[in-house]
Amino acid sequence: MDKYIDKVEKSMKLTEVIKELRELNKSVEHNGMMLNTPTLDIEECCFLSALECFQTMVPQLKARQKKIQQKVVRNLKSKLLRSVVSCNREEGKNKACQGCDSYPLKDSREFVKQLESLLQKALNRLV
Amino acid sequence: IKMVGSWLFLLISLQGYEAPSTPNVNCLFINLDYVNCTWSEQGSPEVNYTFFHKRFIKGNMEECTTYLQEKSFAVGCRLSYDKSDRFRTLTTKLVHQNNMKLYPPVNLSVEMNKDPELNLYWNNSRNTLCIESEVRYRINNNKWQTSTPSKEQKYAVPSPLKSSRYKFQVRARVNSICGESKFWSEWSQPIQWDSMKGNNITDTSGSSMSVWKTVLSLVGTMTLFIVACMLVYRERERLRFILIPIVPNPGKNLEDLLDKDTVEAWLHISKDVCFQPNFTEIACPVREYRLVPQTGSISESESNLSIPTDQSDCLSTCSSSASTFPATSENEQAGIE
């Protein structure tokens, strides 16, 4: 039963972040700014590292509504969310993963889209 | 043709989902300046694909930086050209997201509550929060009314009408939060609710009926065919007579006749010919008459008149018997003298 509640909580959290991200996207000025964007073709254990990369880049977006931007960053840092994307394997948790700078540069629109896809991927794995 | 048709139907219904297949990529070296890789050979794409390529077997896939557009969709990618490229293996990858279609929902059931409230329940093909469902219903075969999609597996009809017939159908897809599937599933098997009877009538008409119709017609056709074959086989001799008429050959019948020489042989052997083997000749009494000269005129006239009646009877009996014997010539000779 605990596992079920845990699952429901996590999925609700993920849903919340995805919705907030969409709100944020509406208020961002997509003026062609380029950001390092992690790809989705990454190893399972590098999920968390990719999320961290995204989380450090979000504040760089030019958003008119700062409140929602801060909320998104806060949620991406949350323990609950991190537990969703964490790796099961003990070995090489953050070892073999790419550094944030090594990911290709994409414009802000692509960046937000990729982050949403990453969160959706996590949600599909969960439910 | 019906056999093929029914097999095709089975194959199609067994398919879980239909996914438009990823198009083929064709790459062309343009004037030793660059490489154009396109995927619009089989028609303009209706979705945006992501293109990747790599020049070396070992190495990472690189995403396309210069997409070629047509009607607001990406149809190809322009790659930079290297002199050795024509002698290398170029590996390409075309990726499309959310090309997905679910099975339709199953186990539909309707029940009327105390309120009164008409509730529809169903099961989605997968038990996950990622699926949203859409309900449509019609009252007494009027226009379909569609609900807003929701993640519940239950739907309540607002203020149901009395003495009406409701027909329900449900379909599902992956919701937007989880990465929306491009296609809705097919509509589920319909279910009917008749407020008069207060019953759950699962409408079996539709695809299941058409399956039955196909099967029955197939069985019927095969049965008829087998029966026809059997009839033809039984009556094959008679049919042969009708279709290929026999040419009469009198030679066969008269073969034994023509072989024999004597008349006696004819009489005894041939039965079909019109000779009477039991012919007995009736003996006719013959009398000789002489003219005695007493007085010239009277005696002549008397002798002329005296024709024996017996002889005329004889003659008649002989000629009446069915024969073509040359016996009559003897009688004639006797009469004159």
Sequence positions of predicted segments:
Chain A
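Extracellular/luminal segments of secreted precursors and ectodomains of membrane proteins
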Residues: 3-127
